[in-house]
Design a protein with these regions (language model features):
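Low-complexity, Gly/Ser/Thr/Pro-rich intrinsically disordered linker/tail segments
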Residues: 252-292
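Active-site beta->alpha N-cap acidic-glycine motif
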Residues: 21-146, 151, 272, 279-281, ...
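N-terminal signal peptide c-region/cleavage motif recognized by signal peptidases
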Residues: 12-14
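Catalytic domains of cell-wall/extracellular-matrix polysaccharide-remodeling enzymes
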Residues: 88-89, 111-267
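Boundary at the C-terminal end of the N-terminal hydrophobic targeting segment
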Residues: 17-19
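Positively charged n-region of N-terminal signal peptides that target proteins for export
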Residues: 1-4
């Protein structure tokens, strides 16, 4: 899905910044608390370590291709699923994710822009998605003890009547009895969702995140019909992070075909793929379980 709100792709956090865990803090969040770039994974910068994440699935065609590539490379990823996409046809893909050592997490029930819906609607949909994910873990025969959530479009905090982080804490207290839900953004957007992206360009972007150089991002334009769309634009990366959390989508052909190329590049350049819960900022520090 279009990440039209996430306009900054590389974090500028100092390597000396203190790592912290991305649970909502025990305070009241206000409208000044927004902007996803403050929530990266600086512990990975300059390490050559990357955490792969895939949003918006499961997809009946593209998700299996990505799982095949990950299995061949013995690499683990995190899949932020839309639980409305899970049905009898796609549930086996969720089970396969878990059986093969990946993390399954919530990206919501549907791909709503959090800033455009009321408090009641947003809370109900996010809560449902987490309950859905818990049920999927149970059905697949796995323990649900890693609670991650990713805001669609990285959109949060722009409502005047409520703040999403405060509601996320409410949901967690109601479902687990503690502040347990990690919110997970990213350091590098692969741009796989931009119209016209090829697998080769997705690979080139990954290389730029490690080595610097040309990077394909996007700009939003209006068509003659008055609709908005995104087109590719090229920028230079002069100071690459050389590590971080990577955003991809398992509903995109460019990622389904490009992930093998990325994993080959990782292997040939002595880089490392780590799972999200191995990253300092996203480690599980609480013994949380869903209430019975």
């Amino acid at each position: 899905m279009f990440k039209t709100i996430a306009t900054i792709f590389f974090m500028t956090l100092s390597l000396s910044a203190l790592a912290y865990f991305h649970y909502p803090e025990d305070r009241n969040y206000t409208s000044n608390d927004r902007g996803y770039t403050q929530y990266g994974a600086p512990s990975l910068y300059k390490t050559g370590k990357y955490a792969l994440t895939f949003d918006d699935g499961p997809h009946p065609i593209y998700t299996p291709k990505i799982l095949d590539a990950l299995k061949l490379a013995n690499a683990k990823a995190t899949f932020f699923i839309l639980t409305s996409n899970v049905n009898e046809k796609t549930f086996p893909l969720v089970k396969r994710m878990l059986d093969e050592g990946h993390i399954v997490a919530s990206h919501g029930y549907t791909h709503d822009n959090s800033n455009t819906v009321t408090r009641e609607v947003w809370k109900a949909r996010v809560k449902k998605s987490i309950i859905d994910v818990a049920a999927l873990y149970k059905r697949a025969g796995h323990s649900f003890d890693k609670f991650y959530y990713r805001f669609p479009y990285a959109a949060y905090g722009q409502r005047s009547d409520y703040h999403h982080m405060n509601v996320l804490k409410e949901i967690s207290q109601e479902l687990m009895g503690d502040n347990c839900i990690h919110f997970a953004f990213w350091d590098f957007d692969s741009s796989d969702w931009v119209p016209g992206m090829t697998p080769e360009e997705v690979l080139s972007n990954f290389k730029a995140s490690n080595e610097g150089g040309k990077y394909i991002t996007y700009k939003t334009i209006k068509t003659k019909a008055g609709k908005t769309t995104q087109i590719k634009v090229r920028k230079d990366i002069s100071s690459p992070n050389s590590g971080g959390v990577v955003l991809e989508h398992d509903i995109q052909h460019s990622s389904a075909e490009g992930i093998t190329k990325i994993l080959e590049y990782v292997a040939s350049n002595n880089l490392e793929i780590v799972r999200l819960d191995e990253v300092e900022e996203f480690k599980i520090t609480k013994n949380c379980r869903m209430k019975e």
